[in-house]
Amino acid sequence: MKRNNFSAVNKVVQSSPVVKQPKRGLCSSLRQTHALSVLLDWGTLPHHVILQIFQYLPLIDRARASSVCRRWNEVFHIPDLWRKFEFELNQSATSYFKSTHPDLIQQIIKKHAAHLQYVSFKVDSSTESAEAACDILSQLVNCSIQTLGLISTAKPSFMNVPKSHFVSALTVVFVNSKSLSSIKIEDTPVDDPSLKILVANNSDTLRLLKMSSCPHVSSDGILCVADHCQGLRELALNYYILSDEILLALSSETHVNLEHLRIDVVSENPGQIKFHSIKKRSWDALIKHSPRVNVVMYFFLYEEEFEAFFKEETPVTHLYFGRSVSRAILGRIGLNCPRLIELVVCANGLLPLDSELIRIAKHCKNLTSLGLSECEVSCSAFVEFVRLCGRRLTQLSIMEEVLVPDDRYTPDEVHTEVSKHLGRVWFPDVMPIW
């Protein structure tokens, strides 16, 4: 192989016109050798080039690369590389992801706490991991965090931490970071006094607050946020906390337009929570103030718990039903949810949804996405639904078992008709058989 390469090079040299080269002295050769060695020395790369490379490397590879030379080690500690960091904490015997090494955690706290801006904690299901996250939070006193996220990968382990310990650690960040803009603290024991401290120190900068499933927070705590954080654009909370006063506060003249409101409607046991109704005038005030807001509602209720919902016009845009929902409720949605964009129904029972779907298609003119799982719809009603919606249906996910043959169409014929109305090829989803 080498012989072939050399012969190819020789041919090129021989075919080139002969140019008389000046004789090179010893100094010229040394200069050429030095220039070549400089080009091959990675340590001479400019800081900004190394920085660009490091930004694409995982932390462990970045740490290894930092030991190549002193210059690379200097770049390793440049503040820009430490703006964003995710602490991963787990018990090795029960978790599948690697934990951030304790030595690295201490190095970050000592050398880079002041550089941290986008921080998240990912913990497994163990209480020990959640407590370790709280210990780190309580040490972040010399930082100016902008975004904070607490993530439980399995069950909500932060809920097992003593409330006083969690609140104390979180308060350290709320007090010392004066520019918090995004906070995701769902499934945690945060409470109303903590939110008041957050508001006192970060009311001018807060833009996003996600705190679903926080049982120690009341409507008063959220109302305090809505009243004072005039720049808040995204909010996620549980329905039992939502009140007319909160919606009116979010609709005040001095408040910026709300962009995203997520509401989780959850019940573990029938009758555990008595759900209230939100007045139509409160919803109307929100839509008048923020006409483009996405109102997203996740329902995990039993059928008998839906009485308070959709009796009047509701400006919901995205609806997800995680448990069975009755035909009566779907009928209300068709009449009272004109802004609906997406509807996902996981289960309905054995009664077909023919008239309910057609009503939704006629009245919900913005609907672009539908998902049906454990439901029943006659093939002809489904085709009529798609015909009414037409090509605005950009997402259509229907399990094959949902479609019930009738005297007009079989499930095999449905895909042809539906594809024609959608303007693209469509097939129902099929449950894989393993």
Curated annotation (Swiss-Prot):
The keyword Hydrolase does not apply. InterPro entries: F-box-like_dom_sf (IPR036047), F-box_dom (IPR001810), LRR_dom_sf (IPR032675). This is F-box/LRR-repeat protein 21. The lineage of its organism: Eukaryota, Metazoa, Chordata, Craniata, Vertebrata. Part of the SCF (SKP1-CUL1-F-box) E3 ubiquitin-protein ligase complex SCF(FBXL21) composed of CUL1, SKP1, RBX1 and FBXL21. Interacts with CRY1 and CRY2. Gene3D superfamilies: 1.20.1280.50, Ribonuclease Inhibitor. Substrate-recognition component of the SCF(FBXL21) E3 ubiquitin ligase complex involved in circadian rhythm function. Plays a key role in the maintenance of both the speed and the robustness of the circadian clock oscillation. The SCF(FBXL21) complex mainly acts in the cytosol and mediates ubiquitination of CRY proteins (CRY1 and CRY2), leading to CRY proteins stabilization. The SCF(FBXL21) complex counteracts the activity of the SCF(FBXL3) complex and protects CRY proteins from degradation. The gene is Fbxl21. One of its GO terms (cellular component) is SCF ubiquitin ligase complex. Keywords: Biological rhythms, Cytoplasm, Leucine-rich repeat, Nucleus, Repeat, Ubl conjugation pathway. Residues 39-85 form the F-box domain.
